[in-house]
């Protein structure tokens, strides 16, 4: 019976993903033993000659994207593994900046299914092994791995990184990673390796990160100590032990993440020209990260879902020229710090359009309204989006935020209507 249910290499990607979601008894099962065994069988523990691994509460995706952009501009063949995806599963694996066809993913899943035998794998472990297998097939120069959760026990940590990066430390996933910044810092520093650079972009670094670096013999490089940056209205400068780079173009991604990516790149020893650095920084962009998708009304997508990200988003919103009102379409997961996240956004949002998110982790619209005092509730993200767009005047701003899921739902609605001709 099990063989009948198991998809084949030619099965649709949707069939595989449904199979993977129900394969393991737990959605999250931190630990490296099972996934390491299967990786060894597949021969994917060294997916490329050079590997960056990027952990952090916020900023992982844009740090990875900046590294990818610069390295591609320098002529390297690059693969990136990131999560979660916004609209399509195939977003999780990029080779030379492009998604791979669904058939490549299903072929890799079939390889893993064959190799795993009776070893049980979570959805994320399966996806990580799949990415590593796809990278190995692509014969890349550099692979960039974005940690899923934490670091020490995350499936990506089966690979020994040549450069490890921790972008930021804030309270999120406390059920899994510990109740405070010190505990979370220790987990994230678990990706450090002996005699290898360990780049930290968090300006208020928990002491546990230094402890782990010392225990492992990693080469710690901290923002504000071994490297730093400064910003003006029209450009920025970066400095480290190698010297100073001046008049850099302002990035489209958050400034601290672009600087952290540059610190990691300069510590890597990989040969990259100053022109490639400039071109890569100027062109790095990632969907759903303060993404302005239209004007009149201005529409902004941002996946901010914890207080640290909401603080950054609030700053970006305040920097925009304000003519009309700000209407926020928001849905969140109930295991996030809803009160702390909304406390930041309240200062820049005039009207709230609250929606529930599906699934056991989704917060209800009413749970969001408890923290807001005023606002409208809707039965779905699509309804909240439609209402906000109907109410918005040309001079207003519609902000879609609160979760990857919220932004993804709105993107899907827009895509469906576009393709349906509505």
From Swiss-Prot:
It catalyses: 7,8-dihydropteroate + L-glutamate + ATP = 7,8-dihydrofolate + ADP + phosphate + H(+); (6S)-5,6,7,8-tetrahydrofolyl-(gamma-L-Glu)(n) + L-glutamate + ATP = (6S)-5,6,7,8-tetrahydrofolyl-(gamma-L-Glu)(n+1) + ADP + phosphate + H(+); 10-formyltetrahydrofolyl-(gamma-L-Glu)(n) + L-glutamate + ATP = 10-formyltetrahydrofolyl-(gamma-L-Glu)(n+1) + ADP + phosphate + H(+); (6R)-5,10-methylenetetrahydrofolyl-(gamma-L-Glu)(n) + L-glutamate + ATP = (6R)-5,10-methylenetetrahydrofolyl-(gamma-L-Glu)(n+1) + ADP + phosphate + H(+). Keywords: ATP-binding, Folate biosynthesis, Ligase, Magnesium, Metal-binding, Nucleotide-binding, One-carbon metabolism. It is an enzyme of class 6 (ligase). The N-terminal domain alone (residues 1-287) is sufficient to bind both tetrahydrofolate and dihydropteroate with the same affinity as the intact enzyme, but is not able to bind ATP and has no enzymatic activity. One of its GO terms (molecular function) is ATP binding. Its EC number is 6.3.2.12, 6.3.2.17. GO terms for biological process: 10-formyltetrahydrofolate biosynthetic process; dihydrofolate biosynthetic process; folic acid biosynthetic process; folic acid-containing compound biosynthetic process; one-carbon metabolic process; tetrahydrofolylpolyglutamate biosynthetic process. The lineage of its organism: Bacteria, Pseudomonadati, Pseudomonadota, Gammaproteobacteria, Enterobacterales. Its cofactor is Mg(2+). It comes from Escherichia coli (strain K12). It comes from the Bacteria. Belongs to the folylpolyglutamate synthase family. This is Dihydrofolate synthase/folylpolyglutamate synthase. Mutant studies have shown that dihydrofolate synthase and folylpolyglutamate synthetase activities are catalyzed by a single catalytic site. Pathway: Cofactor biosynthesis; tetrahydrofolate biosynthesis; 7,8-dihydrofolate from 2-amino-4-hydroxy-6-hydroxymethyl-7,8-dihydropteridine diphosphate and 4-aminobenzoate: step 2/2; Cofactor biosynthesis; tetrahydrofolylpolyglutamate biosynthesis. ATP binds at residues 59-62, 257, 289, 302. The keyword NADP does not apply.
């Amino acid at each position: 019976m099990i063989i009948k249910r198991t998809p084949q290499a030619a099965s649709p990607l949707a069939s595989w993903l449904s199979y993977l979601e129900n394969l393991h008894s737990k959605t999250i099962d931190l630990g490296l033993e099972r996934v390491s065994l299967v990786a060894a069988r597949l021969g994917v523990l060294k997916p490329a000659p050079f590997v960056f691994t990027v952990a952090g509460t916020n900023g992982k995706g844009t740090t990875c994207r900046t590294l990818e952009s610069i390295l591609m501009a320098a002529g390297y063949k690059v693969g990136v593994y990131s999560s979660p995806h916004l609209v399509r599963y195939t977003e999780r694996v990029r080779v030379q900046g492009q998604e791979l066809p669904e058939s490549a993913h299903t072929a890799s899943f079939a390889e893993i299914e064959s190799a795993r035998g009776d070893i049980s794998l979570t959805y994320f472990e399966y996806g990580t092994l799949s990415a590593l297998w796809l990278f190995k097939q692509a014969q890349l120069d550099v692979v960039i791995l974005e940690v899923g959760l934490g670091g020490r026990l995350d499936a990506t940590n089966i690979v020994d990184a040549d450069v490890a990066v921790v972008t930021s430390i804030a309270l999120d996933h406390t059920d899994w990673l510990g109740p405070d910044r010190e505990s979370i810092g220790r987990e994230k520093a678990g990706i450090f390796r002996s005699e290898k650079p360990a780049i930290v972009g968090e300006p208020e670094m928990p002491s546990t990160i230094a402890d782990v670096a010392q225990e492992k013999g990693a080469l710690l490089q901290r923002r504000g100590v071994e490297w730093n940056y400064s910003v003006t209205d029209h450009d920025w400068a970066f400095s480290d032990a190698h010297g100073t780079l001046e008049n850099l173009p302002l990035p489209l991604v958050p400034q601290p993440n672009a600087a952290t990516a540059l610190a990691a790149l300069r510590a890597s020893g990989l040969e990259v020209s100053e022109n490639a650095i400039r071109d890569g920084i100027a062109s790095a962009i990632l969907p759903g990260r303060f993404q302005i998708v239209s004007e009149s009304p201005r529409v902004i997508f941002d996946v901010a879902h914890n207080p640290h990200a909401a603080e950054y988003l609030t700053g970006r919103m305040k920097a925009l020229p304000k003519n009309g009102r700000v209407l926020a379409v928001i849905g969140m997961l109930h295991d996030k710090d809803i009160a702390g996240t909304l406390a930041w956004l309240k200062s820049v949002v005039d009207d709230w359009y609250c929606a529930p998110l599906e699934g056991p982790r989704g917060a209800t619209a009413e749970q969001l309204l408890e923290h807001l005092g005023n606002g409208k509730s809707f039965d779905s993200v699509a309804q909240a989006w439609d209402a906000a767009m109907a109410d918005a005047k040309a001079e207003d701003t519609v902000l879609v935020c609160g979760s990857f899921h919220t932004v993804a739902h709105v993107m899907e609605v827009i895509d469906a209507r576009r393709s349906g001709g509505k």
